Amino acid sequence: FVFQNPDHQIFCSTTKEEIAFGPTALGLDGATVFKRVDEMLTLFDLHRYEDVSPATLGYGERRAVALSSVLAMRTPILVLDEPTAGLDHRLAARFLGTIEKLNQRGVTIVMISHDMRAVYRYCTHVLELEDGKVVQYGPIDRSEAAQKQSRTIRKPRKSNGPVSATHVLLKVTKHEEGRH
């Protein structure tokens, strides 16, 4: 799980230690941990911060550290709360591209997001909640008209096989302070 606020999950002294924490806790050998840390530092352009305390970084960099620390564990299911919040456009696009590649490799992705552009680009299904209740669920309608309206999804259709739910989006439509 990647929290929306990176300060809720970062607790190590340096960026490098933060990224290494998960793989180390999984019992991976040092060489594998080092490789994964290096991959994440490169992916998020964090090498210049590897020996710096994440607490001293800007919000976008702390988000990148939090995201990379979870990605380094290579979990089979990844839950992301507003994954691109606070990231500049370039870093957000890079991160979402990485998420898409992980999904293509079989990682189940659950995104909680208000960013409908990301929804239409990266998700196959939407589960929309309003006041804690499901108001709609189904495959995403990728037509241009539908993308202009956040409440439009395709009606379920018959197919030759089951609909893949490897990429699900939870879209919260009403936010109450302190509750998601």
Set out the residue ranges of the language-model regions:
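Conserved ABC ATPase signature
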Residues: 53-57
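Hydrophobic anchor residue at the start of the ABC signature
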Residues: 67
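H-loop/switch region of ABC-family ATPase nucleotide-binding domains
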Residues: 113-114
